[in-house]
């Protein structure tokens, strides 16, 4: 069984995770706050049916702390547990810190891991598949306006007051990226996709999964234009897109922009991806 723990500040994310073909349990914290370790441990106990539990965690300080506490409690209680941490963000600012934050790419990983578990693979095998996936994906966030806090409406920054966009802004607008003048979709995609291809060492003939995730205030039309430009950019390099996901998946309130996630796939990943999945926000038959 697979579980995840994280703060409750990403509309769309919580509902897309649960039910058939995804996670079994989500341990949810308060708004912009990670759950505590005890809550994550309680979720692990609920998920445990005798075959082990895989804890999937995005690389944020609070989530990591809760995960470590929960893993310690679980081992003390004699549970068979493993943990995989996703941190696929690549550093765009050459002078910035290499934070490796976990972004929307984790959602595809959740389905891959869940599919492997449903096939009856052991906990060790599922954890290995999840870790392999985590090691072969990369993401960048581009923001043009900052998120607002749902409890007080305050903006997290001043990006919306400028004519700039930030490449490498992080999920919640934590910053650490580079602010540049607004560009067209095609030019933005060329900048971002080139960086991701370099990070993954993609070569002609490689198979990839592409996700365009809206940050919260991005229209479907905008996301589809970005996706089209991404597919064309990769095709020109001889890189095949074998699967994709486009939509508002991991968001923050009123943030305009997108995340691009590219994962390097093999036939096993594609086979697992093509298994059924049914959640309130994401279904595959």
Model feature map: region roles:
Residues 1-285:
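N-terminal loops that bind phosphate or other acidic moieties
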């Amino acid at each position: 069984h697979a579980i995840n723990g994280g703060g409750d500040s990403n509309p769309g994310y919580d509902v897309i995770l649960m039910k058939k073909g995804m996670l079994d349990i989500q341990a949810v914290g308060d708004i912009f706050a990670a759950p505590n370790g005890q809550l994550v441990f309680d979720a692990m106990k609920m998920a445990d049916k005798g075959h082990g539990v895989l804890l999937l965690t995005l690389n944020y300080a609070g989530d990591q702390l809760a995960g470590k506490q929960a893993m310690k409690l679980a081992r003390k209680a004699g549970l068979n547990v493993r943990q995989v941490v996703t941190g696929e963000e690549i550093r765009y600012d050459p002078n910035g810190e290499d934070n490796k934050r976990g972004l929307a790419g984790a959602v595809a990983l959740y389905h891959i891991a869940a599919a492997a578990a449903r096939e009856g693979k052991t906990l060790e095998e599922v954890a290995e598949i999840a870790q392999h996936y985590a090691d072969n994906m990369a993401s960048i966030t581009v923001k043009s306006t900052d998120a607002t806090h749902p409890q007080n409406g305050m903006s997290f920054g001043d990006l919306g007051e400028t004519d700039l966009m930030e490449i490498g802004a992080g999920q919640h607008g934590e910053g650490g990226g580079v602010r540049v003048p607004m560009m067209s979709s095609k030019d933005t995609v060329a900048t971002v996709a080139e960086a991701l291809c370099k990070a993954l060492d993609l070569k002609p003939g490689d198979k990839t999964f592409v996700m365009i995730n809206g940050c919260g205030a991005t229209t479907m039309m905008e996301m589809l234009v970005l996706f089209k430009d991404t597919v064309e950019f990769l095709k020109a390099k001889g890189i095949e897109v074998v699967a994709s996901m486009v939509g508002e998946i991991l968001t923050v309130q009123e943030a305009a922009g997108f995340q691009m996630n590219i994962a390097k796939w093999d036939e096993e990943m594609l086979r697992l991806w093509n298994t059924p999945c049914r959640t309130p926000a994401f279904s595959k038959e």
